[in-house]
Amino acid sequence: MVDEQVAVEHGTVSHTISREEDGVVHERRVLASGERVEVFYKAPAPRPREGRASTFHDFTVPAAAAVPGPEPEPEPHPAMPIHANGGGETKTNTQDQNQNQTTRARTNAKAEERTAEMDDTMASSGGQRGAPISADLLSLSSLTGRMAAMAPSWMKSEVCGERMRFKEDVYDGEAETLAEPPRCFMLSFVFIYYCCYLAFLALLAFGFNPLFLPSFMPVGAKVLRGKGRDFGVPLSYGCPTNPFCKVYTLIPAVVINNVTYYPNNTDSLGGHGGFEAAALHVAALFESGCPNLQAVTNRNRTFNVTRASGRVERRLVQDMQRVLASAVVVMHHHCHYETYYVFDGVGPEFGTIPTPSFKDVLAFRPSLVTNCTAPLKTSVKGPNWSGAAGGMKRKQCRVDRLTDRSFPAYLEEVMYVMVQ
């Protein structure tokens, strides 16, 4: 379909022919000077109202075809001198050169006049009759349109002249509501990423750092010491400061003749040593079946050790035998304190010590009298607890022992073994 329009603007008569199938506008303009000019350009697409980017097609107009005019006349060849017959006048090429320069000046003046009139006509129409006829501008508009068409849905924009306006800046109620970029998701992802990164650094700095590994490790078999020497220095090689006084040792104290012998080699009279001899005395009486052994639990229940009949009482007696025998082995061989904790190891590959019994520890003193009323022989001396171990007080050991029920949830344990 072809639309024809005739308009008179400022003395300029324009005849416009537009084709809807391709949007090309063909204008034939008659200037005030009487000269006819033909102009071809492509009408701009209407501004989209649904929020979609405009799509442009390539359409370039050669600069020579934008404002066609009379072709410049070819420059005449230099005229050859003509000699008149009979010695007439001679015509030089100076006159021809002057004539060519005059013609060229007139042509340039007409071209400048046509260009000025075209600019005035486009300015008076407000730029609404068509897009700029420059080939460079048309190519730039086509490139801008393709870029807008390839953008994501949330970045779709409207092209307004030479400026691309994103949908975030458009406040048009009729425009399509486009999805916003997931800013909250991106921020949360970055936050979680950095938290995991910091946790990984902390794990490397502390969890896998050998300087922060626990000092306790299975020491293998017995770490023997020469007799008369001190035990290992507390806190070195994993030695606890209060040996056998922690809740997880569960080593009962031994009461003989109203004197209490504590697992840290102290007694209620303020003396040092004697716990190994007291434990061996209890082992000898138990193996002889003496009825004068009484056990006191943390629940203030008292029962006979050799005549225990209930399920709980038998379990308490077995635990009492195990821990007393283990303590005697550690003290007799001058082992490090932590050796006590590897009696129940995972296997022989770690060099663990088999859990001893009363019969095993009685082999240390085969001449021990098995009389139930025999007094305690203190000839067996414990190791020297002077120096770093001197700060271990009976009161502290008595308070710490079996008062914390958090490891593990023991129901009842033997706190004292009394020889009556």
From Swiss-Prot:
Segments in the Intravirion topological domain: 1-184
Virion surface topological segments: 206-420
Transmembrane segment boundaries: 185-205
Glycosites: 258, 264, 300, 304, 371, 384
Residue ranges with Low complexity bias: 92-108
Membrane topology: Single-pass type II membrane protein
UniProt entry keywords in alphabetical sequence: Glycoprotein, Late protein, Membrane, Signal-anchor, Transmembrane, Transmembrane helix, Viral envelope protein, Virion
Region of interest called Disordered, as start-end residue ranges on this chain: 1-21, 64-129
Subcellular location, record wording: Virion membrane
Record's GO cellular component terms: membrane; viral envelope; virion membrane
Primary subcellular site in the record, as a coarse category: virion
The family this protein is said to belong to: Belongs to the herpesviridae BDLF2 family.
Domain notes: Plasma membrane remodeling is mediated by the cytoplasmic tail.
Physiological role: Rearranges cellular actin to increase intercellular contacts and thereby promote virus cell-to-cell spreading. Induce the outgrowth of long, branched plasma membrane fronds to create intercellular network for virion traffic. The fronds are actin based and RhoA-dependent.
Quaternary structure and interacting proteins, as annotated: Interacts with BMRF2.
Protein name, entry field: Protein BDLF2
